[in-house]
Amino acid sequence: MKICIAQQNYHIGNFEANTKQIVDAIERAKQQGVDLILFSEMSVCGYPARDFVEFSDFINQCYASVDAIRKVADTIGVLIGAPAHNTNEKGKPLYNAAFFLYD
């Protein structure tokens, strides 16, 4: 198995730029025969997101970016970081989550 770790400079709240960086890295990794590419914590939204995570539009944009990235995870496994809603009744309302994408 060929694994790639993508260390990039993400920008807080700049979903378009962060998503483009991630998609570009995935495309390069595919060309190199990578099986799994790993991105850093909160790569989708930039870190630290601080108070931005309290706004539902911020979280919705995170989910939209994750969905856009999922579409290019057709022949490669992708592990990315983003905040996620806690669907349990207990605990904090958000998690610092890892999303595994593979179509």
Labelled PLM ranges:
Residues M1-D103:
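Hydrophobic structural segments
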